[in-house]
Amino acid sequence: MSIVTAVVDAHVHLHACYRPDELLSRARQNLAQARPSSDLPTLRVFYLLLAECQNDDSFGDLRALALGGRARSGLKLQTWMVRTTDEDRCVVVADGSAHIYVVAGRQVACREGLEVLVLGTTQRFEDGRPIRDVLEETEALGVPRVIPWGPGKWFFRRGRLLDSLLEEFRKPTLFLGDEGGRPEFWSYPAHFARGARLGVRDLPGTDPLPFSHDVAKVGRMGFCVPVELDPLRPAASLLRSLVNPNVPFERFASLEPPLRFVRNQIGMQLRKRRRDSHQASA
């Protein structure tokens, strides 16, 4: 095993509107632009941590391809290749000398309007449950659980709830998560400083939205962390560092331009209205 710097995007979706090869190439390009300090090891490896919604299983598709089968969704790779590791929760994708570890994880939409990312697991969780129940259930897994930022999600009632959750569930496996969708004019939310005082750290990632143009930002927000890498068990190697409060993180970020932020928010509202209209007519 060797000590390396892991360059990580901790909130990734492989949406159906994306071309998988483009996502991986963009991620490789963006992660390679991160500039760790001289205190971190020179050798770098790249990670994408998936946070898949209830009905999605892109990781399962990638693993099926790695095992020589077909993806249920029809997902295909053209220039990138995928192979298994010794872990059911991690595959490695490669294009020539470039490779990225892709780690399974889930995104749980909770009843209160907050979300929990459960990283490094293939276990499924139902949406719509109270967030306290989700945090209690996932605590036993010993993997990172992240409450991600979202526009307006940490204000008022939900902001007060978040304050309570930070007090109740503060452990090395609980994190907050900054997102690449935060616009340049939106300052770093105060809850991150509050969490840091309680030992709840920021585990940032891009959280690309389900629009084809958003694939370009995968890998633009994340962090660098020293890892004792076992190439056969790369997920366990990374997660061991993440839940160790004595291991430092160095975040990097490219925030959303204001016009792109407004465009995406309008697009998400229109998407939600179409979905609600379809459900009402069904």
What is the predicted role of each segment?
Residues V45, G142-P144:
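Loop/turn elements at helix/coil->beta-strand transitions in domains of secreted/extracellular proteins
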Residues A51, P148, G205-T206:
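Generic beta-sheet signal
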Residues M1-S97, Y101, V108-C110, R132-D133, ...:
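An N-terminally biased module of ancient metal coordination in phosphate/nucleic-acid-related enzymes
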Residues G128-R129:
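Caspase-like (clan CD) cysteine peptidase catalytic core
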Residues M1-A10, L14-D21, C110-Q123, E136-L141, ...:
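Charged catalytic cores and adjacent phosphate/nucleic-acid-binding surfaces used
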Residues I100-A104, R160-L162:
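Short, functional N-terminal and low-complexity linear motifs
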